[in-house]
C-alpha cells in the first residue's frame, strides 16, 4: 500500500516540482483572497500556465493553487467579513469577531493551521480509500 507513495517521494522533492507547488500556493492565496473567485475558478484561470510544463510539475502547481486558495479565502473572511471562497463562509462566524477584538493575527493563524491539518487528513483518507474504490469501480465493467 505504501510502496507507490515511497516511489513517488523523489519526484515530489525535485526542485522544479517544489518551486511549482510554492508558486501555486502563492497564486492560490492571492486568488482565494479575492471575493468571488473560488479555488476551482483559480485553477481554470491559471491552467494555461501549465500547458508548457511537465505534467507532474503542472499537477503540483494546480494542487498548490487549490490548497492556497482554500486558505486564502479565510483572509477577507477574517478581516472584512466577506468570504473569499464559498468554503470560508463559516470562518466569518468566528474569525471576524476575533478580528474586532484585536485578535486578527490569531484568527488567521488558526485558519492556516486548520487548513493544513484538514489538507493532510484528507490526503491520507484519499490515499487510503482510493485503491479499494478503484477496484469497486472496475468491477462495474
Q: At which residue positions do the language-model features occur?
A:
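A cross-family phosphate/adenosyl-ligand binding-site feature
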Residues: 3-7, 54-64, 72, 103-104
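Juxtamembrane transmembrane-helix boundary signature
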Residues: 60, 64-93
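Helix-loop-helix hairpins and the membrane-proximal interhelical loops
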Residues: 1-56, 131, 135-138
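Membrane-embedded alpha-helical modules
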Residues: 107-141
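Short helix-coil transition sites and intra-membrane helix breaks within transmembrane domains
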Residues: 31-41, 78-89, 121-125
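Hydrophobic alpha-helical transmembrane segments
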Residues: 18-22, 59-63, 108
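Membrane-interface alpha-helices at helix entry/exit sites of multi-pass transporters
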Residues: 56-60, 97-114
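Transmembrane helix-bundle signature of multi-pass membrane transporters/permeases
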Residues: 29, 45-48, 62-70, 111-116
Amino acid at each position: 500500500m505504501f510502496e507507490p507513495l515511497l516511489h513517488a517521494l523523489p519526484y515530489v522533492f525535485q526542485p522544479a516540482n517544489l518551486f511549482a507547488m510554492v508558486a501555486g500556493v502563492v497564486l492560490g492565496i492571492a486568488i482565494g483572497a479575492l471575493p468571488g473567485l473560488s479555488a476551482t475558478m483559480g485553477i481554470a484561470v491559471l491552467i494555461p500556465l501549465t500547458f508548457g510544463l511537465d505534467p507532474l510539475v503542472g499537477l503540483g502547481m494546480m494542487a498548490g493553487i487549490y490548497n492556497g486558495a482554500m486558505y486564502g479565502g479565510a483572509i477577507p473572511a477574517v478581516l472584512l467579513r466577506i468570504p473569499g471562497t464559498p468554503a470560508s463562509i463559516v470562518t466569518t462566524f468566528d474569525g471576524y469577531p476575533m478580528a474586532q477584538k484585536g485578535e486578527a493575527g490569531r484568527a488567521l493563524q488558526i485558519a492556516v493551521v486548520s487548513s493544513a491539518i484538514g489538507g493532510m487528513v484528507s490526503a491520507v483518507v484519499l490515499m487510503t480509500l482510493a485503491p479499494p474504490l478503484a477496484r469497486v469501480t472496475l468491477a462495474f465493467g
